[in-house]
Amino acid sequence: MITVNVDLGDRAYPIHIGAGLIGRTELFAPHIKGSSVTIVTNTTVDPLYGDALRAALAPLGKRVSTVVLPDGEAYKNWETLNLIFDGLLTDHADRKTTLVALGGGVVGDMTGFAAACYMRGVPFIQVPTTLLSQVDSSVGGKTGINHPLGKNMIGAFYQPQAVIADIGALTTLPDRELAAGVAEVIKTGAIADAGFFDWIEANVEALNRREPAALAHAVKRSCEIKASVVAADEREGGLRAILNFGHTFGHAIEAGLGYGEWLHGEAVGCGMVMAGDLSVRLGLLDEASRQRLDAVIAAAHLPTRGPALGDARYMDLMRVDKKAEAGAIKFVLLKRFGDTLITQAPDEAVFATLAQTTR
């Protein structure tokens, strides 16, 4: 087992990474202070790992209940969030009840938001079961739900007590979900660590094959990078926005097609191709680096051309973005691997990128 710490003073927490961690009672025990636990999971993950988690919690002598949500990005909304609150209120959960998010990014984001809101804040633990959630969404305290007009526009910054990333859970992940997680790994290397990007290029096939050593390193290094960014800028006042490389275009794709049509990581992968193209057009990135970025995204079996939503629709959707200011779209662009710039771009350059990178 590897442990990475997120240094946030009195709200610091560990990220435990390894195989077989869902069943290890001792990893949960220090973070559960009250008399009850509510597991929040979904219809796909509960049959796979729910019993193992409940067995791990049993020796703690707590009252354990489970809320099972429908599976998918399409359900990341108020209606599904209320199912969590319904369960908590029905079970008479109190301020010391610990929520445990067992699932991917949708489960983790909604459980964290419910924890932030219920009785104005109860503790929660992240147990991410997808590669995307292990390398990205479970770390850093971003929680929330989608709105029909924009992704993740309603939410809160609320840190977990711990993240327990069991890479053994990745063996049951569908291929599309695995590729979606690799997209976030690629993003992390591209924005923050040129050496890690080199490693990803050399090991993308090992990740595709789910080789445990490659997966463990990808999760560890991604978490180290994200932990250091979050520690420096917890509430995305500046530096943390670099983690949104590929997300301005990507979120537009998700909202434009309808949530769940493309996986989040698929949209981010394509969004990085689009952001790379725009980076070259603005004279920030060299063509050879753009080609390397496109090649590794394609090697991860991610889409490299976006849907033809139309220029006007893309622009409208990208204005509904947390980085936008006074309606002006801001993009995270690459200068070189490991070095980014957050900037506006002329409409003509964006239109040229859309013409080049959409169907």
From Swiss-Prot:
Q: Which GO terms describe its cellular component?
A: cytoplasm
Does the keyword Amino-acid biosynthesis feature in the UniProt annotation?
yes
Zinc as a keyword of this entry, yes or no, is yes
Q: Which UniProt keywords apply?
A: Amino-acid biosynthesis, Aromatic amino acid biosynthesis, Cobalt, Cytoplasm, Lyase, Metal-binding, NAD, Nucleotide-binding, Zinc
**Which Pfam families does UniProt cross-reference here?**
DHQ_synthase, DHQS_C
Q: Which residues bind Zn(2+)?
A: E184, H247, H264
Q: So which cofactors does this thing need?
A: Co(2+); Zn(2+); NAD(+)
Record pathway = Metabolic intermediate biosynthesis; chorismate biosynthesis; chorismate from D-erythrose 4-phosphate and phosphoenolpyruvate: step 2/7
List the InterPro entries: Dehydroquinate_synthase, DHQ_synth_AroB, DHQ_synth_fam, DHQS/DOIS_N, DHQS_C
Please state the Enzyme Commission number of this protein: 4.2.3.4
Q: Which residues bind NAD(+)?
A: 71-76, 105-109, 129-130, 142, 151
Q: Which CDD domains match?
A: DHQS (cd08195)
What are the recorded GO MF terms, alphabetically?
A: 3-dehydroquinate synthase activity; metal ion binding; nucleotide binding
Q: Which GO terms describe its biological process?
A: amino acid biosynthetic process; aromatic amino acid family biosynthetic process; chorismate biosynthetic process
Which N-terminal residues, if any, form the signal peptide?
none
Please report which protein family the annotation says this sequence is part of. Belongs to the sugar phosphate cyclases superfamily. Dehydroquinate synthase family.
The function of this protein is:
Catalyzes the conversion of 3-deoxy-D-arabino-heptulosonate 7-phosphate (DAHP) to dehydroquinate (DHQ).
Provide the protein name.
Answer: 3-dehydroquinate synthase
